[in-house]
């Protein structure tokens, strides 16, 4: 992908508060609450993990079990590197499910790409599918269904390669479900693993 080059003179009058506001208001960063609040997630009283976290959770009637669901997409990662982006979106779905205490069971996908008649678009598609397959096999997270949508473009320009993954997981006892909110003052936040090198497509 093309990279925007920043010149030193462009930074002279830059104010950090303006940069922060711009970043926090970007659709990829800002709150998505206005979207999911439009649906009444309390219908039938089955929702036990409200929207806003990494996965939604609904109870299974007559049991202590619950089903967790997550939908993830990775256009920016796939645009930068389709193989890695395909792996990343499967891993994100997996992480979002285990973050609420669910055992990931299976995924479905919706693969959105430009025209397959364009060699670059077709190459992105092939690599992305390969990445999804490799990650799913490694994680034992089977792809049970899927859909491909080609020719998503304006004139001759295709959209960024956009795989969307819907994942489901099982929680055997929803009383042990994990929620994202802090439980008390001075809770500790831990970062596991190395974090360097992720800013480019974050």
Where are these regions (language model features)?
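Glycine/proline-enriched, intrinsically flexible loops and inter-domain linkers
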Residues: 1-202
């Amino acid at each position: 992908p093309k990279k925007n080059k920043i010149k030193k003179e462009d930074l002279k009058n830059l104010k950090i508060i303006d940069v922060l506001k711009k970043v926090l208001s970007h659709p990829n960063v800002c709150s998505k609450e206005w979207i999911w609040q439009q649906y009444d997630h309390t219908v039938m009283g089955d929702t036990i993990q409200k929207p806003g976290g990494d996965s939604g959770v609904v109870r299974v009637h007559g049991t202590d079990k619950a089903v967790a669901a997550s939908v993830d997409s990775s256009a920016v990662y796939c645009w930068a590197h389709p193989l890695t982006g395909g792996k990343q979106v499967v891993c994100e779905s997996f992480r979002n499910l285990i973050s609420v205490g669910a055992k990931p069971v299976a995924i479905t996908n919706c693969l959105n790409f430009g025209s397959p008649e364009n060699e670059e678009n077709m190459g992105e598609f092939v690599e992305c599918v390969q990445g999804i397959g490799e990650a799913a096999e490694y994680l034992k997270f089977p792809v049970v269904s899927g859909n491909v949508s080609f020719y998503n473009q304006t004139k001759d320009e295709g959209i960024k390669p956009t795989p969307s993954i819907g994942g489901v997981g099982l929680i055997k006892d929803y009383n042990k479900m994990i929620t994202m909110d802090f439980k008390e003052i001075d809770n500790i936040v831990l970062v596991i693993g190395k974090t360097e090198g992720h800013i480019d497509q974050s």
